[in-house]
Structure formats: C-alpha cells, structure tokens
C-alpha cells in the first residue's frame, strides 16, 4: 500500500511540475509577454493545481517576438524568436 501511494505521489509531482514549467515558457521566454503575465500571481492562483495552461489565455506570439526582423542571438529570449522563413524556433 505504501509503495502505491509513493508511486502516485511521484507521478503527480512530475505531472504538476511539467505543467507549472509552462509559466516560464509563457512569461520569460517571450520578450513580448504582456505586463499582465505575472508568473508569481499565476503561481499563487494555480498553486494547488497547476494543470492545464498555467498562463491562462496568454499564448506567446511568434509573429515577431524580437521586435525586429532578425533575432538577437545573444538574447535569453532567442528560443521564441522567429527564423528567417517565419516559423517559430523551438
């Protein structure tokens, strides 16, 4: 019985952690994230259940997240920048 509870707890921890990590993707990787996207506030609201989209309705925009036609390769937000062919870099 204890083993089953331990396995369930580990599984839930991994699942909730992966969901909570989306906050980083939404709020920190995209330099055009709106000021209303406050990860601390989101964590407070979703503290008990981080399932689903932890950033609410905010979706990072891949149209031109760097604010120019080219990406700054030194930028910490380079992950969200668009490539020359217009697709979003992963």
UniProtKB/Swiss-Prot annotation:
The keyword Disulfide bond applies. It comes from the Bacteria. Pfam families: Chlam_OMP3. InterPro entries: Cys-rich_OMP3_Chlamydia. Keywords: Cell outer membrane, Cell shape, Disulfide bond, Lipoprotein, Membrane, Palmitate, Signal. GO terms for cellular component: cell outer membrane. It is found in: Cell outer membrane. Disulfide bonds: none annotated. A lipid is attached at residue 20 (N-palmitoyl cysteine). The keyword tRNA-binding does not apply. Residues 69-90 are annotated as: Disordered. Its main location: membrane. One of its GO terms (molecular function) is extracellular matrix structural constituent. It is a lipid-anchor. Residues 1-19 form the signal peptide. A lipid is attached at residue 20 (S-diacylglycerol cysteine). One of its GO terms (biological process) is regulation of cell shape. In elementary bodies (EBs, the infectious stage, which is able to survive outside the host cell) provides the structural integrity of the outer envelope through disulfide cross-links with the large cysteine-rich periplasmic protein and the major outer membrane porin. It has been described in publications as the Sarkosyl-insoluble COMC (Chlamydia outer membrane complex), and serves as the functional equivalent of peptidoglycan. Part of a disulfide cross-linked outer membrane complex (COMC) composed of the major outer membrane porin (MOMP), the small cysteine-rich protein (OmcA) and the large cysteine-rich periplasmic protein (OmcB). This is Small cysteine-rich outer membrane protein OmcA. It comes from Chlamydia pneumoniae.
